[in-house]
UniProtKB/Swiss-Prot annotation:
Catalytic reaction(s) noted: UDP-N-acetyl-alpha-D-muramoyl-L-alanyl-D-glutamate + meso-2,6-diaminopimelate + ATP = UDP-N-acetyl-alpha-D-muramoyl-L-alanyl-gamma-D-glutamyl-meso-2,6-diaminopimelate + ADP + phosphate + H(+)
Gene that specifies this protein: murE
Binding site for ATP: 113-119
Keyword rRNA processing: no
Gene3D superfamilies tied to this protein: Mur ligase, C-terminal domain, Mur-like, catalytic domain, MurE/MurF, N-terminal domain
Chain sites annotated for binding meso-2,6-diaminopimelate: 386, 410-413, 461, 465
Its EC number(s): 6.3.2.13
Binding site for UDP-N-acetyl-alpha-D-muramoyl-L-alanyl-D-glutamate: 24, 26, 41-43, 154-156, 182, 188, 190
Cofactor entry: Mg(2+)
Listed name of the protein: UDP-N-acetylmuramoyl-L-alanyl-D-glutamate--2,6-diaminopimelate ligase
Native source species: Pasteurella multocida (strain Pm70)
Family: Belongs to the MurCDEF family. MurE subfamily.
Amino acid sequence: MRRLTALLGQVELAPNIELTEMILDSRAVKQGCLFVALQGHQVDGRQYIPQAIAKGASAVLAETEDAQQHLSTKIEQGVPIISFYQLGSHLSALAGLFYDNPSHKLTLVGVTGTNGKTTISQLLAQWTTLLGHRSAVMGTIGNGLLGQVKEATNTTGSAVEVQASLADFVKRGADFAAIEVSSHGLVQHRVEALAFDVAIFTNLSRDHLDYHQSMENYALAKKRLFTELNSRHQIINADDSVGQTWLQEQPNAVAVSCQTDFKPHQARWLKATAIQFSQKGARIQFESSWGKGELHSALIGQFNVSNLLLVFATLLSLGYDIEKLMKTVPQLTGVCGRMERLSASNQPTAIVDYAHTPDALEKALQAARLHCQGKLWCVFGCGGDRDRGKRPIMAKIAEQFADHVIVTDDNPRTESAAQIVQDILAGFEHPQHVEVCHARDQAIIQALQKADSDDVVLIAGKGHEDYQIIGTQKQHFSDQETVQQYFKVNHHHA
């Protein structure tokens, strides 16, 4: 329970009201809430003040563009409506006060960049859990303690949601949290008042340009996490051109590189000196300002070497013991359904990935190839009632980057599965070499049966999804379960 005066000092007319929570969406208002009426990107929350009052809001905080109006109060139906100048940019701090500044009560790491945010926050939570923490994540796949994640709508929730989620983590005993910070979230001041222990920058590519107009604006948006917001340590990918520029401006930041010929100019740095890929994952030899050694990673792909090293540098800069980190690294699994490796003795290695666009399929096949001593198999399909144009393009990519291809169904929805497959087959130069098997479980089993033990089978398109949509029916189906079941039955065959 928060008193209004604790938030805003002695606001004239505002009685000492007790408030239960801060709410931005008038539809979610309950008895005892503080309704926050913001002038948003698309919607003006101030239009909904009457609805909020009708639903029992105890007080309203309304944005104003007029500095003279700041903290002036009017009463409507017994409810104080308090004007607040430039409320949007102060909301993180107000929500921080309201929820008792939870970011000060745990170790908080913010991750920004185009790719890798989700994997990095998962790896941070997994690794710190192995080291005895109670760790939480906030981002694309949801918010919550590791293993109890609830789905979320945006990568970075509103300023209020972020503070409320952190307060919830603290209440549940978390002492470590990794949060994905989107560029939208930075521009809209959603993480403004958080005390970050570490900020990580992954990389920058053409993403969300409709919102930010140009690459330069986008880079500036991301950079706010390192310059204007308070973070004790900055970890920056030195293999990215934007990262290199930032490192020149931030002498105290930690430079992280996968390039063996990298010459560090920072006092603190980490680089890979040799990387060996195999079906088991990657062996990474490293040197750093903390010492040198070897990491045995079960993760797949070059990009996951970069992700892992950024996480490793983060934990080293927070003071974790280098030997303990090296000992626990093989237990890290990354994100469910993203280049997820499944294996059994004397069996081919299976990789399940959610790649369902041409670009993602190409990257997944190239990553799988790094780990493949024998032949590379690809099992994929294309969704029905969705972009038809990509079907032949994905065929071309599968043919170019894999040795054997099996085309199967992937959520045909209300389209004819046979028609979808025809659209895909049109993209192959040699369709006679391609197998078609509509039943997805059978397609996966066929690939695993035909592949040798040093082959790799990439099963693309579903990732963490555990359903198949046929017609309008959602049926339970999981690529992982199909593979695990097959391995369980066949593991004893030499």
